[in-house]
Amino acid sequence: MTGRIFTADHHVYDLPPLLSWNVRHTGTVPCDSWSVTAVYQPEMLTVLRMAAGFAAIENGMTQLRGIVDEYTVELGSRGMTVTLSGRGYAARLLDNESRPVTYEQVTLRELIRCHAEPYGISCGAAADLRPTVPYTAGAGISQWKVISEFCRTYGGFLPRFAKTGELLATPEQDSGKRIILDSGSPVLNCRIREDHYGVLTEARVIDKRQNVSYSVKNPEMIAKGGQCRRVIYTPGRSTWDAMRYTGEYQIQQSKKEEQAVTVTLPGSFGAFPGDRVTVRLEKLGLTGNYRVAETENRFSAREGAVMIWTLKECG
């Protein structure tokens, strides 16, 4: 893999051959992250001090665009090395707060123009969301929160980032691509985890102004003996639909980390968040269709190139 640096004064610099690297894709928040280590050369110092952007390039294809958060020069057992690390482009929106603002009527495109484009974010696709009610961005929230809450409330989805750094503000689509994992796949490690901690059995939504409440339950977790209730207060004049949606959303959010399959394979960049995987690992009792939620691609002289996929069951 090639690590390419973009400086604040618009110069491009390719790092020396990498000794090790790690690229993690989530597609959303927590945002993508990366780190690379290379042999340090004294002439690099000027570049490092101005390093602002990063691209991970594998076989001529960009696998990640991000920002540079830090660099470290070290004299150790491997000689003089430099390690750089940073995050994906979602960091540009997470690191910047919005001023308080209320839009009487606003489209998603207009929201992106005001809250994403000023921070160097280009939009690859945006849903045609045009709510007829006011939308308020409160004080102290990030630009990411402004856009993601709008998409969640009026579109029922969360925006994400392509590996090239473009914002994708549309519902995720199934590309039709299928990855097969079966007994013939070169699986180095596979782990199944189920964690009930924090999974809600009930979400009670209360509108204090109207003195009404709505309860949404999670029968699957109740059947497993779970007992975890949350009470959520909403702004006044909430509709029954809005209250039900809020309760269902809280339960779905609590279930996101309940089950996960982690698979380690040789190679790099074989999957990306959103890809679909058909699993047929009968020895583990593991079969079904899964969505790639997160990937980690790493390389070192000791273990070579490996990729770790975190899979979640397709809903």
Q: Each PLM stretch: what is its role?
A:
Residues 25-42, 79-89, 205, 257-265, ...:
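Oligomerization/assembly interface segments of phage tail-like spikes and tubes
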Residues 42-48, 126, 266-270:
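Short, surface-exposed secondary-structure edge patches
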Residues 50-53, 99-105, 183-189, 220-221, ...:
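Short intrinsically disordered coil segments
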Residues 32, 64, 80-82, 163-166, ...:
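Envelope-exposed proteins and targeting segments
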Residues 79-81, 87-90, 125-198:
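Short beta-strand-centered interaction patches in the first periplasmic/extracellular domains
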Residues 1-4, 59, 148, 163, ...:
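Acidic, small/polar-enriched beta strand-loop surface segments
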Residues 36, 86, 100-123, 138-162, ...:
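Amphipathic, non-transmembrane alpha-helical segments in extracytoplasmic/periplasmic proteins
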Residues 1-97, 177-193:
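Assembly/oligomerization scaffold segments
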